[in-house]
Amino acid sequence: MDEESLQTALRTYDAQLQQVELALGAGLDPSELADLRQLQGDLKELIELTEASLVSVRKSKLLAALDGERPAQEDAEPLALQNAIAETAEVPVAPGAELETVPSRETGPGPTERGQEEDDGEDEEGGAALSGRKVNAPYYSAWGTLEYHNAMIVGTEEADDGSPGVRVLYLYPTHKSLKPCSFFLEGKCRFQENCRFSHGQVVSVDELRPFQDPDLSSLQAGSACLAKRQDGLWYPARITDVDSGYYTVKFDSLLLKETVVEGDSILPPLRTEPAGSSDSDGSDADDPSYARVVEPGAANPGTCSSAFAGWEVHTRGIGSRLLAKMGYEFGKGLGRHAEGRVEPVHAVVLPRGKSLDQCAEILQKRTRAGQAGVSKPPKCRSRGSGPGGRPPPRSVFDFLNEKLKGGAPGAPEVGAAPPGRSGKEVYHASRSTKRALSLRLLQTEEKIEQTQRAIRGIQEALARNAGRHSVTTAQLQEKLAGAQQQLGQLRAQEAGLQREQRKADTHKKMTEF
């Protein structure tokens, strides 16, 4: 509704309220008086809501009128701001030089002190003149994103690099760390640097931009925005409805409910999508707040010998797909200038149980050996395996093992194991054989259970189809006969594996001392 409709409705409600009040003073029945009092309360509440809507519409019109006058002032504000800050930051050199040329016995300490006091007074006056001025200041988030927020200057300070700077407080805080501390503004904050709220941020003068009033004319249903909540923070949201200066917004966070706000509690998003026009391309080319677009032929892709995302063959990672969605091109380095490393970081497996110093010595020895070209001969798996090697010493346990196996020393059978195996190797072989037998026995038992379940299912199907379908019954009987035959074979296989397992256990007990 526009302003005229609201004013007409307000006059109508006032006239109705006067009629109700006259009726109440006429002395009617108690039952009618109760209805009239309820109607009187409803009319008063309706008048209050209409007046609030009228105030909101007038406020929106006033903001729109101010937005039309702002562009003419914005052109002169940046230059005036730069000049004002430069004047406060500069130290007058000429008067000091003149005072130094005059002999000290003639001038005395009085003029010098007065000059310093005047300089301090000028600095304080300049800082006081800048305090309260609104600007557009940069803010680097915790994850490295550069954003420009509307802020207010609270004083002049020197930046970290020595350049002139100002301390600013952000007007539309999106995080708790940006929300101004109310006690700091009063000079009563006890936490100082440990305060979880903002005490201002020192920004270089060169990074400041002119203050930008929020443009609400571009906001409509479906537009992204920032909406203010009761905690004083601005959260990302999306407009679902616009009605007479009131905006119904739905927050991006699922924990926040849909709400209705006025025009002073809503903002366009701080980071908008680029329009893609040629004018903006030229102005943003040298802006440090935008990432530089690297042309395909401009950047040196480097040499990448390793297969990109080759490690994902062995994992379930989605790193390569995420990088591709974020605009990464194969062969280029990471970073906005594509200057990062190209080769992936190779994993180095260090010896187990060694200190870092010992690992460093081992790596140095390997490096020196590789540079000198020294190649060590491969180690033999067992002594005496080659021709002319010395036979291993024999013990009582080797003699017992040979006797229990039925073999004669010095006359091995064809296809038998070489006589050079010690008792420890025989023990390891029997252990691996026992593990393989246990695995085969477990698989056979699982197959037996599956076959038994299949037989039970076929028998149930035969019971259901008995005397109904002769063809189906014949097929089921054939399946049942085949399943029973397979079950018999599996049981025979299970018995054979159990015999081999018992034989291995007996062999282990007889050969292990």
From Swiss-Prot:
G-patch domain residues are 315-361
The record, for Pfam families, names: G-patch (PF01585), zf-CCCH (PF00642)
Checking InterPro entries in the record gives:
G_patch_dom, Znf_CCCH, Znf_CCCH_sf
Where do Basic and acidic residues bias regions lie?
497-513
Which residue stretches belong to region Disordered? 90-131, 267-296, 367-394, 492-513
Signal peptide region: none
Q: Does the keyword RNA-binding apply?
A: no
Q: Does the keyword Transcription apply?
A: yes
Q: Which GO terms describe its cellular component?
A: nucleus
Q: Which GO terms describe its biological process?
A: negative regulation of DNA-templated transcription; negative regulation of epidermal growth factor-activated receptor activity; negative regulation of transcription by RNA polymerase II
Subcellular location(s) per record: Nucleus
| Compositional bias (Acidic residues) | 116-126
Start-end of C3H1-type zinc fingers: 176-202
Annotated GO molecular function terms are: DNA-binding transcription factor activity; DNA-binding transcription repressor activity, RNA polymerase II-specific; RNA polymerase II cis-regulatory region sequence-specific DNA binding; sequence-specific DNA binding; zinc ion binding
The Phosphoserine modification is found at 278, 355
List the SMART domains. Answer: G_patch, ZnF_C3H1
- Domain of life, per UniProt, equals Eukaryota
Its biological function? Answer: Transcription repressor that specifically binds the 5'-GGAG[GA]A[GA]A-3' consensus sequence. Represses transcription by recruiting the chromatin multiprotein complex NuRD to target promoters. Negatively regulates expression of EGFR, a gene involved in cell proliferation, survival and migration. Its ability to repress genes of the EGFR pathway suggest it may act as a tumor suppressor.
The record describes its quaternary structure and partners as: Interacts with CHD4/Mi-2; the interaction is direct.
What protein am I looking at?
Zinc finger CCCH-type with G patch domain-containing protein
